[in-house]
Amino acid sequence: MIKLRLKRFGKKRETSFRLVACNSTSRRDGRPLQELGFYNPRTKETRLDTEALRTRLGQGAQPTDAVRTLLEKGGLLEKKVRPAEVLGKQKQEKERSAKKKDATASETSE
């Protein structure tokens, strides 16, 4: 599987990243298949090769979470709102009972 990920480079404490396409089993700083862009978190500078990115996404490449946010800001992907998960049985039970109360309250008001 091809992943779109950030490859770290630069000096100590002055890092910047290259956006690369690479095999999912390769190392973080290993040899990439293709370089697709650049991101500097200090200056917020971002350069993206939009045609190459669209091609890779069309081929089924999966972006990491950090790359996904960069692509959403660049307008290449639509922003997806992920629903928050509630962990724990007690919290889930509280939510269910609250939904039931809301449903019964709306039925009685009608």
Curated annotation (Swiss-Prot):
Signal peptide: none annotated. Residues 81-110 are annotated as: Disordered. This is Small ribosomal subunit protein bS16. InterPro entries: Ribosomal_bS16, Ribosomal_bS16_CS, Ribosomal_bS16_dom_sf. NCBIfam families: S16. The gene is rpsP. Belongs to the bacterial ribosomal protein bS16 family. Disulfide bonds: none annotated.
